[in-house]
Amino acid sequence: MHTDWSVFKGLASKPSQAEWVKANVFLLGDIHNHCSLSYGHGSLDHAIAFACQQLDFFSVTGHFAWPDMNDDAMNIPEEVKSYHREGFAKLRLGWGEYLAKIKASKTSGIIPFVSYEYHSFTYGDYTIVCKDLDTLLPPEPERVDTRLADLVAKNDAQASGVICMPHHIGYKEGYRGISWGHFNQKASPLVEIISMHGCSENIDAPIKYLHTMGPRSRHNTMQGGLALGYRFGIMGSTDHHNASPGSYGSGRAGVWAESKESNSIWDAFLQRKTMALSGDPIMMAWFIDDRPLGEVVELHDHAVLDGYILATERLSSVEVVSDGETIRSYTDFPPNGSNKKRFNFACGWGSRGMACDWNISIRVEGAQVTDVVPRLRGEYIVDPLAECDESSELLASVRHCENSVHLVCRTAGNVTPTTDGTQGFSFGLEIEEEYTVIVDVEAVYAGQSHTKTFRYASSELKDGPTAEYIDGFVSPAFSLSDEIDSGECLLEIHENIPVKKDGYIYLRAFQKNGDVAYSTPIWIELR
């Protein structure tokens, strides 16, 4: 995404903040997702290729072990135990090939990490993320499996190069939700709070828990852990089970790092310079007394908060949260009248289960395409036992070429009326007074090929979004948004906040398209 921090006038009078923004880059990643490496769907090759389309860093995660799976009190069906055992064994057999392919992915310009996963009723589920790309799996236990227990209790992420990241923490304790009583922030500098399971920022957070594993429970949330005094960075991951790291809408991580290099990203993990995103890369650079997110600040009686929020879509609200309470809320994001605009494009719809292969080009006359933000989704399959045709893994892709954008993808309708199966992207324009957006569509649907061209004058694009169908009613369609003024996508905050006790402050932002972003807190200690 094109980032022009000069739009924030307050940075000019905040030299240390301006220097921090200049010295750091915002990166997008997903370090917890699955494929057929253990149990799941889709090949590792496809997972790596999919990650390269829209992420800066990634991992593909193997299901590794479930130490207390045989707890009779939990009444786990035998077929569930069986596919877990088979998946764990499959991971061990394929680990060498996995490491080789993960290491080879570096040549594509993406930064890889190694990861595997423990399930646990007692501790909650953990993704074990490893910096060393030659990491071997732990040996099998001789008797009682204490490997996860030992990691959670004894690991020091700063020294070991291993992060124990709890995920889908919102489930009930004892039912694979987090056990805050066993949590160790030295072992776990990161906690995942958004994924395809839902959002666990707080008990009422948008994106409900709707998986078969159950609802959110009591204090098993980000705010619940913070209230206990823990300090951790927050992450989003897809937890996608169909070879689609970074699948749009399922959860992603935003990281502020000094560079797009493995060491810098790992340092950012350890320093808690992280954000949890549902989809779009909503960037929040913010400070208390000139100290950035993830840090601990000593104060007397007030906090000077400065924030700079840059979204890819119209913002609907931004909130400042202190110790679980919303203390500031911003809902006014007026157009600034600049020549920088944004648009959203999406294609899909049509009859459920009927594939449409798209080849789309968007060209612009009288304006310059400044940036493109992909919104690519993997096919949404959760059940490891579900049938899935993996004979042809079409890779969706978005390319920005000079003054045009090209999208190649397949859609097959929406699984339910509330499940988004579209593919698309956001793009920025630097415009002249008048301009034209041209959409060239090639689509193959129901055995027929359709080729169409649509032209939209800038005057039309100020009058609301457009919708076009390729072959009449309930055929696949595309949508091009109306013109979005860049002022509607940004916010600058400068606040003096009274502080009466030790605690934490963080930001959360909401876009009008439903995407959300949460920042890691800044912790406050009174002098």
Identify the function of each model-found stretch.
Residues M1-R527:
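Extended, charged catalytic domains and RNA/DNA-binding interfaces, predominantly
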